[in-house]
Amino acid sequence: VRAREGRAIKIEGNPQHPVNRGKLCPRGLTSVQGLYNPDRIQAPRKAAGRGSGNFIDIPWDEALSTASNLLGGDPAGVAFLLGYQPDHLYDLVKEITAAMGAPAPVRYGALGMFEARATLIEATRQTTGTAGLPFFDLGSADVVFSFGANFLETWLSPLAYSRGYGNLRQGKLGKRGYLVSFEARQSVTSGVADEWIPVIPGSEGLVAKAIGRLAAQINGGTIPTAFADLDLAQAVQQSGVSEEKLHHLAELFAQAQQPLAIPGGAALGHVNGLASAKAILALNALKGAASAWLAAEDDSAGSLASVVALVNRMKSGEIHTLFIHGVNPVFELPAALGFSDAMKNVKAVVSFSSFPDETALLSDWILPDHTGLESFGYQRV
């Protein structure tokens, strides 16, 4: 962070950071705007009637005393809905809820849902025994099969994967890397791929199994259990990918020195998402791909099911106090879930938003938190 007279003026990448290597994505570059945004809430506010849009400023002592009193009620009726804020804050809230006997915090973020983080973590847990987000080293591979992972746009860490894509194309293994993208739509990643395979949504797992089975046969090895139950004719019919194309892709994967298969995004967001993720991850075991490795163990990625359960508890009146931090559920959640209507059955709603977003305007209190440039914590890597 470049500062002048104690004021942040620009954010740049750290050349020594293993992820960005001195670069930064547009979202990071513009984050300084949140610090000086004229609409930023400067002090705690109390609603003059929920939903009225009218608030009065209150002292921090009164705000903190109110929050403390709200936590003193029946712990079973206290709920925390968090976004994808830094891990230190999630860990702190998790410890607080455990100590007071309240339900564990629910985590949600629209972007995380689009990325299918929870599905990928669960597939990794069932495949490797460790719940964590895998990192895929594109730069160390020579052939990459991307199933729905639009890593050149917003998927997980677009900056790190863009750098990896550049290394893939430069040919670390002596030849230019080859990219095949399996997506129903032609995203940015599919647009620059050597081959774009427009599969029928929900059939990505069958395609991965077909490629795995055929690649194992080409290599002359035993067919792994993950691919043993495949019906090739069924895979062709349900995926829309011809048998000839599947044989071509299997040969490409089998002959690669360091192939890599990446599950994510759209492939995991459709029906059979978990099964597809497991089948795609299993492709990496065919030749012992070293280009995929696990980040720190992490089970904190929220699922839509946990949010639905929370909304149902709100509707039934089980929740008397709701704390919301780092997420705007009134805007981000599908309207069909009825989150804003469910809020009417909650006695007290506290938002920690720094801006008057849709959820904050329907809350009883707004206790604005620091921005990332004003706080310090940790992130598991």
Q: What is each PLM-predicted segment?
A:
Residues 1-220, 242-248, 325, 366:
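N-terminal export/assembly segments and adjacent metallocofactor-ligating motifs
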Residues 182-187, 352-358:
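Short, polar loop motifs at secondary-structure junctions
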Residues 192, 217, 223-239:
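Conserved thiamine diphosphate
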Residues 77-86, 237-238, 264-270, 297-300, ...:
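Conserved short loop/turn motifs at secondary-structure junctions
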Residues 154-175, 279-282, 334-349:
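A short, gly/pro- and small-residue-rich
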Residues 253-320:
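A glycine-rich, hydrophobic/aromatic-adjacent loop/helix-cap motif
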Residues 188, 357-381:
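Flexible glycine/proline-rich, aromatic-decorated loop/lid segments
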